């Protein structure tokens, strides 16, 4: 099988995970699952970035050892991913022993290339961004606080700290040449243009070590320095592929990575610094870096100060994991900023899932159970209406594959639901409930053909939504009598076998019932109900 290596960004475990983390994990997982179902040998890496000043300060504020806080919070991130059905192959932590070896080796390689030198640094540093800023990149607010212009985060002055620098200035032409030769290296297009513009303006050497704290990977031969967190963090992608053992089967098979999935706020680290590090170290660059957008809550940016940060686990407990996965990938054009609201989730659940998909499956399968002994019927000759619908369904895989390759999962789901919309119109226009009552053998044959055609397109839809809704799609395929070896995408072209015995039909996508408290926030109401039930227990 052809290998495919896909990664998420690794999260700082300095605080609880939020809906933005879940969004990236779900999207990346959907692609990983799609590739597996499409016959590829997938390696899926995710994890946490446990080093850096941000984590150290969070531990100090909590009054616990830094390693303890990092370990505890990393566990929270891993459990959330498991609850979201994220099918990772490895959950890496940057405190893992093999990662220390990888980080030290890439440093040695960059040093051997002459790209690391010792100097002193004075300037502004953002703990939240784990990033340095020159004076022109900051501004002083009316309240006397200085912030980074780009991110709006607080910056503090670092005074003449001894540090190692990386010769980023030497890589301007090499980076621009790579972008030009590999137009798909950065996506979406707006981020590619942003990066090219940034690099074209020239690059400055930047600090890659710290001596003012010790929570990180020590610099080889210089233990008084710890690596700048981004060298350490970015190297996790290599660690996950077996580096520094470049002769290993793992590294030979999976590196370079096919896709780094990240948020747009860290595009420079991944599309400028990371390829420069790899060029310096003599390591092949990843194939593609894609930066998704941010989620807003009812049109507002989420922040702790506003109090509108969404807990993904509360959403899952209220609406269901597959429902949340579907909403996030269907509602928002991937790569753009998007809006989250409880009302929008409920609309998708009731309109798309319960009505368009669930109701079509339930009606057709119930008719098979009631009138045909729960056995897939033998169709008679197909009419033009049957053929048109089946042709649309048959063509979905190629279209959806192209959408997933371009990280356009919303378009893939849109295409599937357009077909389901046509299937619902077909079912209504063919009126199988009337055909069923006819004593004409021709009408009975037509009845069986309509049900067969409907069940077949439901099967194809269920196959194709597996990456997004694995549990629900699995239940739908169970109802259609499909065994585990009939669920890869190769099965799309193999027609549903007449004579297949089906289990009694059950609903897969129930409608969401509004909260008992009219106008209440369903997530908060659900949380209150859970607390009430706990007290009763």
UniProtKB/Swiss-Prot annotation:
InterPro entries: aa-tRNA-synth_I_CS, Anticodon_Met, Met-tRNA_synth, Met-tRNA_synth_2, Methionyl/Leucyl_tRNA_Synth, MetRS_core, Rossmann-like_a/b/a_fold, tRNAsynth_Ia_anticodon-bd. ATP binds at residue 304. It comes from the Bacteria. Disulfide bonds: none annotated. Gene3D superfamilies: 2.170.220.10, HUPs, Isoleucyl-tRNA Synthetase, Domain 1. It is found in: Cytoplasm. Is required not only for elongation of protein synthesis but also for the initiation of all mRNA translation through initiator tRNA(fMet) aminoacylation. This is Methionine--tRNA ligase. The lineage of its organism: Bacteria, Bacillati, Actinomycetota, Actinomycetes, Mycobacteriales.
